[in-house]
Amino acid sequence: MEFENLNKVQKMYAFSDQEMSNYLEIDRATLYRWKEAGEIPESYDSKVNALIAFKEGVRDSGFSLEGKVDYVKVTFKTQDYIDVIAKVLCLQNKPFLEEEKGGSGYDTKYTFQNINLFISKKREDMGCMIELKGQACRQYEWYFENEQKSSWRDFFIRCFEYERTISQGEGKFMNIPRLDIALDEKYNEDGNFELGKLVDLWNRGLVESRLTMKQIEDNGQYGKAKTIYFGSRQSAYHFCFYQKDIEQAKKLGLDIDLIHSSLKFKNRYEVRMCDDVALDFVRKSLNERIDMARLAVWVINSKIKVFERMNGDKVLNREWYSLLGEVDRIGFSTSPVETGFFDKQYRWLNENVSGVTALIKKWENITGDNKLKKILFDGEISDKNWKKLE
């Protein structure tokens, strides 16, 4: 048998040479000899064929994953935030408004919709930081598609290009302090992967990883909502797996069956990276033209191996790799959302004021009072809010 057949399977499941050798019960020197010869001895055909058959078997599963950028922070060693808005974000014609409070150690924030940019007026060495978190990513994607005709790939290319324009001497003039890639497992009427099984497999010694595993359970109306962490949240990378359907049902106040039928959410698998790990991830994606969803799956598979027992043998877990094994079924997507300038204010009014206003109006119809109208029309607009209207 040609070694290339084994090589394809090894790459697909992100096995290191040592892990592949252990799985085949050979030493690494033997694996290297096979690689150099380009062939595998006939006596190992059955084991390798079982791996290849496993690969083909998971290809046709009903599981599917959809990946997206869900959180990104990019810093530059410059305080010229206007230049960063124009040349990196390409949002130079948008009204970024200054806010007195900053965040992440910065004292000043400029914000447009949910898109944030920070600087420190007291510490020039901090430069500036772009922050796109959750909804901000979806809003920015709207400008990708409707105004810029660009993509996340283009955005990160602009980041590296901008670093070159501001570089002065040695050192790093750009960093990615945070990058989260979210992999959403869509709801499947025929069944989905149950996160509790991963905990059970871990307890039975059938999950191999150098990372620590921690499970958090939250009791609620939908039962125990599970969140599983691999690795420390203080480290350069960690994984967070959780039940997205339950999270959204709580957040939106909707029935979980509606979340399944309309939004198609089930589980989410997040790869969270910081600093050099995030930089290397983006560089690999750009240089090798690998979409970030597939690369995120490769990262998970390189750090976590999941097995099961079959006829006494320890073999790859078919259900897990049906979800995270066949990368050809994994797509990178955008979910652009157009947001009006005062949408946050309208949402706040709807959630916090509309009910009370309706109650007061009913009361005033009974009593004949007219205080509500006076309150609504006598309100003053602050200087900060006048700027939003300019």
Regions found by a protein language model. Name each.
Residues M1-Y13, D313:
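A short, Lys/Arg-rich alpha-helix, primarily the initiator
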Residues E4-L6, Y23-I26, A50-I52:
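Secretory-pathway ectodomains
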Residues L6, D17, T339, Y346:
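Helix-turn-helix DNA-binding elements, focusing on the entry/boundary residues of the two helices
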Residues S16, D27-T30, E338:
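Short coil turns linking two alpha-helices in DNA-binding domains
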Residues E19-N22, F342:
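Short alpha-helical "recognition helix" segments of helix-turn-helix
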Residues E25-I40:
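Recognition helix of helix-turn-helix/homeodomain-like DNA-binding domains
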Residues I40-V58:
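DNA major-groove recognition helix of helix-turn-helix/homeodomain DNA-binding modules
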Residues K55-G340, W348-E390:
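Structured, helix-rich domain cores that form ligand/interaction pockets
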